[in-house]
């Protein structure tokens, strides 16, 4: 038999086909099974790797950007920026990012390590202010290009073409309910659309912070769940495929993320904790007995070591005695 080389050409070929795993030890009282889609297993450790590559490739194919000449400029809560910085480094793009000052220190360090230029914004200016700041940078940057993750159709499209089919394949078509947080809306929209085309009875549940319930018609507000709850209804969120909006408090998201580490061995971020908390609520409903819930875990926990998620553990680790 002829040997086949499986070495990838570059980091972009590592994106996708992330594993799924059942939750086993945090499911007391659940009557449905929960399987987590582990997007922290992407090469740059978050679901945003998919859209970073898809938006860059789409712009390249349309002749809008050129490696070695163009500069990518984007407002980000962190993970999309990290994805863009990773892909930019691999493909020869300068990357300039606008990020809220409330995002974790780890994100800043990672972005700088990847060569991105970083501009921090005051949380009070919100997404609208970040977009204005991004446009101002664009006006002064020759060859600049804004991928516009909140509006770019390449965002939900990559989830429709990859994430959705992966979930359908790996669950052998047995998925009944999808649970996903909403940042840009791309994951829920792309995956939800694909799954509903395979089985119209599949339900799509999206997650938002109770402290900023904009999708439910409430007012935006500060919250602890980095990566979701942007304070707007994103253009890329197709509400026609959404069956339910589930609100999760920041503290609940944090506690659930801690439990996932302690009981499942899954070190995940706060938005993954929020998604898991929502999935657990759905899994305890009597009408969902015997069903399979797939929940998307967007990122791992290492990017949150300086946040409230690890406050008590960090203090303990910093004060361990030397024996």
Swiss-Prot record:
Cofactor: pyridoxal 5'-phosphate
Swiss-Prot/TrEMBL keywords: Amino-acid biosynthesis, Cysteine biosynthesis, Cytoplasm, Lyase, Pyridoxal phosphate, Transferase
Gene3D superfamilies, A to Z: 3.40.50.1100
Gene Ontology CC terms: cytosol; plastid
EC number: 2.5.1.47, 4.4.1.9
N6-(pyridoxal phosphate)lysine: modified positions: 48
Catalytic activity: O-acetyl-L-serine + hydrogen sulfide = L-cysteine + acetate; hydrogen cyanide + L-cysteine = 3-cyano-L-alanine + hydrogen sulfide + H(+)
GO BP term, pick one: cysteine biosynthetic process from serine
Binding residues annotated for pyridoxal 5'-phosphate, in chain numbering: 79, 183-187, 271
Presence of keyword Transferase: yes
Cell location: Cytoplasm
One family name in Pfam for this protein: PALP
Chief site of localization: cytoplasm
Transferase as UniProt keyword: yes
GO function term, MF aspect, one: L-3-cyanoalanine synthase activity
Residues making up the signal peptide according to the UniProt record: none
Induction (free text): By nitrogen starvation.
Gene disruption phenotype: No visible phenotype.
This protein's pathway: Amino-acid biosynthesis; L-cysteine biosynthesis; L-cysteine from L-serine: step 2/2
Tissue distribution of the protein: Predominantly expressed in leaves and flowers.
Superkingdom, natural source: Eukaryota
InterPro entries cross-referenced by the UniProt entry: Cys_synth, Cys_Synth/Cystath_Beta-Synth, CysK, P-phosphate_BS, TrpB-like_PALP, TrpB-like_PALP_sf
Free-text function comment from the UniProt entry: Acts as a cysteine synthase. The cysteine synthesis reaction is more efficient than the cyanoalanine synthase activity.
Entry similarity comment: Belongs to the cysteine synthase/cystathionine beta-synthase family.
UniProt name for this protein: Bifunctional L-3-cyanoalanine synthase/cysteine synthase D2
Gene symbol of the encoding locus: CYSD2
